[in-house]
From Swiss-Prot:
It is found in: Cytoplasm. The keyword Hydrolase does not apply. One of its GO terms (biological process) is glycolytic process. InterPro entries: ATPase_NBD, Bacterial_glucokinase, Glucokinase. It holds the Pfam family Glucokinase. SUPFAM superfamilies: Actin-like ATPase domain (SSF53067). This is Glucokinase. GO terms for cellular component: cytosol. Belongs to the bacterial glucokinase family.
Length: 343
């Protein structure tokens, strides 16, 4: 299985600027790299406002052209979706396209497509102290793997593994779809309701924006509270942290507890002595609440492996556009070596 796709014509140059696009289930963020890791002209567009990726890219390129900027010939896109061939269909939206056809339609020499959390993993080395908040103490081992997990529209999972001779390889996978194991009574309520309506309950079903709505609906039904229309994720978080609504607070408690448990599972699988990084669009807004929650207790509640996990530092990524440096790295590697460093 391929972990990235690079559609290209015979390149006649590898010059800047280069186009970067981080495509989530809700938003697509475009940027222009004008020199190595010099990234600017960031624009966020709603996925739902454009019929296709090509249309959204044209919208951004038209704005560049109108400003007099030089148009890029090389591009990299991160997708909230597995990338296993030329044809891509987003998991949490209806965009579907051919990478090669999109490259040709836009007149690009190169178009690299990778998973969005793989690009975020590639970008971890470029995060500075101001881009992170440490929520668990620990001592990171520089030569060890780093784990990455993050809830947003879906649940992204990746990691960064040091490679022999220097550098690192980002892992491409779909770890957000692993089985979910509830522990507390409220978690079981949410799990049973989700199982009844959807069948198999993956981690993403509850650890995502849609998961917040699902958890709240399940707790509401259990308590006999009438909810005519399911709350949106934004309504749940506002209810918990601005209005102190009891059901919304219970929803967030379930969410943070499950996240601690799943993050620890990912760390154990990866041997993430280099640390655990929490990304995605939800957590950066609620770092104090996450720190005050059961997350840390659940992270180490793994029986005989408690001592192992207790050594691992955990960080929340708070940078505004943390995946863009990883996309720049993937594109540079492709232009220099034919493919990004992805395993």
């Amino acid at each position: 299985m391929s972990n990235a796709m690079a559609a290209s014509a015979v390149p006649d140059d590898t010059a800047y600027p280069r186009l970067l696009a981080d495509v989530g289930g809700t938003n697509v963020r475009f940027a222009l790299e004008t020199a190595p890791m010099q990234i600017g002209a960031v624009t966020a567009l709603k996925v739902a406002d454009h019929p296709s990726l090509e249309a959204a890219m044209r919208h951004y390129r038209d704005a560049l052209s109108a400003s007099g900027a030089k148009l890029p010939r090389h591009a990299a896109i991160g997708l909230a979706n597995p990338v296993t061939g030329d044809h891509v269909r987003l998991t949490n939206h209806d965009w579907a396209f051919s990478i090669e056809a999109t490259r040709q339609a836009l007149g690009l020499q190169t178009l690299v497509a990778i998973n969005d959390f793989t690009s975020l993993a590639l970008g971890l080395p470029y995060l500075g102290a101001n881009d992170l908040v440490q929520i668990r103490s620990g001592q990171a081992v520089a030569t060890a793997p780093r784990a990455l997990i993050g809830p947003g529209t879906g649940l992204g999972v990746s990691g960064l593994v040091p490679a022999p001779g220097g550098g690192a390889v980002a892992l491409a996978g779909e770890g957000g779809h692993i089985e979910l194991m509830p522990v507390t009574d409220d978690e079981w309520i949410a799990w049973r309701a989700t199982h009844a309506s959807l069948g198999r309950v993956s981690a993403e079903r509850l650890l995502s924006g849609m998961g917040l709505s699902q958890i709240h609906a399940a707790l509401s039904a259990e308590t006999g509270t009438r909810v005519d229309v399911p709350l949106t994720p934004e309504q749940v978080t506002t209810g918990a942290f601005a209005r102190h609504d009891p059901l919304c607070e219970r929803t967030m408690a379930v969410f943070f507890g499950l996240l601690g448990s799943v993050a620890a599972d990912i760390a154990l699988v990866m041997g993430a002595l280099g640390g655990v990084y929490l990304g995605g669009g939800i957590l950066p807004r609620f770092v104090p609440a996450l720190q005050a929650s059961a997350f840390n207790a659940r992270f180490v509640a793994k029986g005989r492996m408690r001592g192992y996990l207790d050594k691992l530092p955990v960080y929340v990524i708070t940078a505004s556009y943390p995946a863009l440096p990883g996309l720049a790295r993937a594109l540079a590697d492709t232009l220099s070596h034919g493919r990004p460093h992805i395993g």
